[in-house]
A protein has these predicted regions:
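Internal/C-terminal transmembrane anchor helices
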Residues: 146-174
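Transmembrane alpha-helices of multi-pass inner-membrane enzymes
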Residues: 96-150
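Interfacial juxtamembrane loops and adjacent helix segments
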Residues: 1-6, 10-12, 16-19, 26-70
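TPR/TPR-like (Sel1-like) alpha-helical repeat modules
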Residues: 259-274
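Boundary/linker segments of alpha-helical solenoid repeat arrays
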Residues: 244, 270-279
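Hydrophobic transmembrane alpha-helices and their immediate junctions
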Residues: 71-99, 264
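Membrane-interface segments at or immediately adjacent to transmembrane helices
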Residues: 167-240, 248
Length: 279
């Protein structure tokens, strides 16, 4: 969690990113990487920006600012047009409609200080559900004849069943990952038993890479080390995690390329100037 001062600094850096990518944004999925680079630049020039240590900033803690940074002004304009249209439709219902709009305010307020849509399915479901209720009550309704009456019944069974199966595989995957971590990254078979690694893809992939590096160093396998380096260098473009820089430098060191190892290490220290690095 970040303090009020830290959030203001996140807004400040995020706004600078948006000013440099005004129309089209920096690209979807780029916030983690581009924020880290802008933050490091601010720290390097002595700007009075709050220290984040080794913490990663995944979101600016403001939904509209998040869209501005990654998508630019265009998606925000589109969203505002939808909001205005929705409010106009709802106002036709009088005072009762205004009470319905009030259901949105707690969630909308939350989106300006946190990132509920980014990491909370419940917030998103509630938000969509409120839209559905208001649209059903005050919106224009269209009806069509469904000749295949069995389809809704089948979907009512299939969707919950698939959801339960998926959630069970997520729990099993989390359990296996936890067991693997408790072994000190030694028993790879726990990781291999995970049924749904895609549900925790980033965490799973990073753990798999960690085990890849451990095995490669132990076996002194240069091909495995080069393979690891190739994968991590690609990942760093969108996920510049501190531990990846440290491990990548270690991989180059294992290959005997100390010059490159120090280059990677210094790059990591530049991006994470407040972290506790071990020289």
């Amino acid at each position: 969690a970040f303090s009020g001062k830290a959030r203001l600094n996140i807004y400040k850096v995020s706004f600078k990113i948006w000013k440099d990518h005004l129309i089209l944004g920096s690209g979807y999925g780029s916030f983690l990487s581009i924020f880290r680079n802008y933050y490091a630049k601010e720290r390097s020039i002595g700007s009075n920006v709050t220290s984040f240590g080794s913490k990663n900033v995944l979101h600016p803690h403001n939904e509209f600012l998040f869209w501005l940074v990654e998508g630019g002004i265009l998606p925000v304009i589109g969203f505002l047009i939808m909001i205005i249209g929705f409010i106009k439709m709802t106002l036709k219902g009088g005072r009762q409609a205004l009470a319905s709009i009030g259901c949105f305010f707690p969630i909308l307020f939350h989106t300006q200080l946190e990132y509920p849509f980014y990491n909370s399915t419940i917030h998103l479901i509630l938000f969509v559900f409120f839209i559905y209720l208001i649209d059903k009550e005050y919106g224009v309704q269209y009806h069509f004849k469904n000749n295949l009456k069995i389809i809704p019944k089948l979907l009512a069974i299939i969707i919950p069943l698939c959801s339960v199966i998926f959630l069970l595989t997520v729990l099993q995957t989390g359990y296996m990952i936890n067991k693997y971590e408790k072994t000190g990254f030694k028993k790879l078979e726990y990781l291999e038993r995970a049924l749904n690694p895609y549900s925790m893809k980033k965490k799973y992939d990073n753990l798999a890479l960690k085990s890849h590096l451990i095995i490669a160093k132990k076996a002194k396998d240069q091909n495995m080390l080069k393979s690891y380096i190739s994968i991590v260098e690609k990942n760093l473009k969108h996920s510049p995690f501190m531990f990846l820089y440290y491990d990548l430098a270690t991989a180059y060191q294992a290959l005997g390329n100390m010059e490159k190892a120090w280059e990677i290490y210094k790059k990591g220290k530049y991006l994470y100037p407040d972290a506790n690095w071990k020289d």
